[in-house]
Each structure stands twice: as structure tokens, then as C-alpha cells.
């Protein structure tokens, strides 16, 4: 999957697809680096729902491209525009991004405006809510413990706090403004009673403080399907009725 992230390519479905290959695509996954690490999670759900999804992601391009406070584009706009126009060909659009990092008013405004436009033309939007961040030092200690390196660690619980996200967290804003969107919250698997695990099946799922590793994303997808109905099956059902 070396052609799927930061290559600014669109439509290279043979190189970059998720789920079950079929004659026609069921949708497109777009976003920034969070979309890249969510792909393996989505692959588990897509295979279970028998969906065929293409993905195209690049850093700094959550839905469109990040913008400065004066409204100017932080990165070249062509990829964002071309990717969005391509996405409009499909009924289902999957979006994963660093939503916690989206605090600038101009970024938020552009994202919500674009989402509204997609919903108005009949697109089904599926948003992925990212895991709570851990700290680099916590992750480092967990890896030391996992490697059985003989170091003294005063704390062996490497779970992270399920800190409260602000009321204006953009995923909450999306759901308030556009109730029809589906939000798949990865925290539902990892967090309980105010604590969030960083491991599944004795495997650390984080690559760094806020990104999943591939094996962790796959485990997360499998764990999600054990405790939740697969929301993507509803998409497949609607497309065939």
C-alpha cells in the first residue's frame, strides 16, 4: 500500500482498496494521516459487509486542505478539489482525520460547509472518531515492559485517561448539524470507566501517541465487530434494495 498515502493519487484502486474487490466501488475513504492508519480497521468492517472501497489520503488534507486563519490554503488545493470531486461519484464517503487537532475556526468552517454540501447532494457520510491520545513516554514504557527489558517501572498500568473532549469538538458539531452521518467511534472498544487501554490481545495498538499501527488497527476492527453491529452492512443493504 505504498501508493496510498502522501502520493496525491486518486483512482488507483488496484493499489489502494479496502474490503472485497468487486466490479464497482461502494465508496471512498479520504482524510489525512488518520485515514491512512484507519484503513486497516475499515478493511475488517468492509470485508464483513462485503464492500469495495478505494482510499486516498495525505497529511494536511482532512476533508479539504487545511487553511490559514486568513482563509488562504496551507497546502496546494488541487489534490483536495480533485479528491472531493472524485468522492462525489460515490454514494458513501468515509472520512478519518485528526479531528482533535482541528481547532482553527477557518478549518472548522470549511469542513462543516463541505460536509453540508455533500449531504445536500445525497451522500452518506461515515466519520471515524479517533482514539484518545496517549503520551510518547507512556508508550515507550509500555514497549519496554513488553520487550521484558530489565528496567524498573513504578507503574505497570499503561492505560490512558478518557479525557473529556470539549463540547465544540468538531465530531460533536458534525453530528449536531448533520444527524444523518454515521460516527464510528474507535474509543468504544478501548475505553471503559474513564480509562482507555493501549493494548488488545497483548498487542500495543498505537504506532505513536495518536496513530494506530496496522496490526493494532486490525485487532481494533475485529474487537469492534464482537461488541457492535457493523454499521456498514446497512450501507450494503440500502444499495441493493
Regions found by a protein language model. Give the residues of each.
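Extracellular/periplasmic envelope-modification machinery, especially enzymes
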Residues: 1-241
Amino acid at each position: 500500500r505504498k501508493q496510498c498515502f502522501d502520493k496525491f493519487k486518486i483512482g488507483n484502486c488496484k493499489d489502494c482498496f479496502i474490503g472485497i474487490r468487486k466490479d464497482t466501488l461502494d465508496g471512498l475513504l479520504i482524510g489525512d494521516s488518520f485515514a491512512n492508519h484507519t484503513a486497516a480497521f475499515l478493511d475488517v468492517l468492509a470485508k464483513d459487509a462485503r464492500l469495495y472501497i478505494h482510499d486516498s489520503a495525505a497529511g494536511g488534507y482532512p476533508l479539504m486542505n487545511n487553511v490559514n486563519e486568513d482563509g488562504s490554503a496551507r497546502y496546494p488545493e488541487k489534490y483536495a478539489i480533485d479528491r472531493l470531486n472524485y468522492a462525489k461519484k460515490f454514494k458513501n464517503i468515509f472520512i478519518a482525520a485528526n479531528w482533535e487537532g482541528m481547532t482553527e475556526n477557518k478549518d472548522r468552517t470549511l469542513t462543516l460547509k463541505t460536509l453540508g454540501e455533500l449531504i445536500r447532494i445525497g451522500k452518506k457520510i461515515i466519520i471515524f472518531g479517533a482514539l484518545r491520545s496517549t503520551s510518547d513516554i507512556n508508550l515507550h514504557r509500555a514497549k519496554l515492559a513488553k520487550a521484558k527489558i530489565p528496567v524498573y517501572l513504578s507503574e505497570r498500568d499503561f492505560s490512558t485517561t478518557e479525557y473529556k473532549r470539549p463540547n465544540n469538538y468538531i465530531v460533536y458539531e458534525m453530528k449536531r448539524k448533520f444527524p444523518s452521518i454515521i460516527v464510528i467511534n474507535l474509543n468504544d472498544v478501548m475505553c471503559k470507566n474513564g480509562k482507555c487501554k493501549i493494548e488488545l490481545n497483548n498487542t500495543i495498538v498505537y504506532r505513536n501517541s495518536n496513530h494506530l499501527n496496522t496490526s493494532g488497527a486490525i485487532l481494533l476492527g475485529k474487537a469492534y465487530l464482537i461488541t457492535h453491529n457493523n454499521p456498514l452492512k446497512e450501507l450494503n443493504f440500502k444499495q441493493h434494495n
